[in-house]
Amino acid sequence: MAVEKFETALKKLEDVVKKLEGGELSLEESLKAFEEGVKFSAFCSKKLNEAERRVETLVKQRDGSFVTKPFEGEE
C-alpha cells in the first residue's frame, strides 16, 4: 500500500466500503477488499493519532499572556 496522504487513504477506504455495501463482489473479492480496507483504516488511524499528538491548545494566563499546552482530547 503506497499511500502517503490521509485524504487519499480515506477516499480509498470510502470506496472499499461502497464496494462491500454494494453486494456485487464475490466472496473472494469481498475478502480481498476487506483486507485492503483494514490497511487503509489502520493508516488513517495512525495519521490521526500523529496529528492529535501535534495539536496544542492556546491558554491565556492571568497576566494576559498566552502559553501553549498539549491538547488533552476526550478519552
Curated annotation (Swiss-Prot):
Coiled coil: none annotated. The keyword Cytoplasm applies. InterPro entries: Exonuc_VII_S (IPR003761), Exonuc_VII_ssu_sf (IPR037004). Keywords: Cytoplasm, Exonuclease, Hydrolase, Nuclease. Its main location: cytoplasm. It holds the Pfam family Exonuc_VII_S. It catalyses: Exonucleolytic cleavage in either 5'- to 3'- or 3'- to 5'-direction to yield nucleoside 5'-phosphates. One of its GO terms (molecular function) is exodeoxyribonuclease VII activity. One of its GO terms (cellular component) is cytosol. SUPFAM superfamilies: XseB-like. It comes from the Bacteria. Heterooligomer composed of large and small subunits. Belongs to the XseB family. NCBIfam families: PRK00977.1-4, PRK14066.1, xseB. Bidirectionally degrades single-stranded DNA into large acid-insoluble oligonucleotides, which are then degraded further into small acid-soluble oligonucleotides. This is Exodeoxyribonuclease 7 small subunit. The lineage of its organism: Bacteria, Pseudomonadati, Thermodesulfobacteriota, Desulfuromonadia, Geobacterales. The gene is xseB.
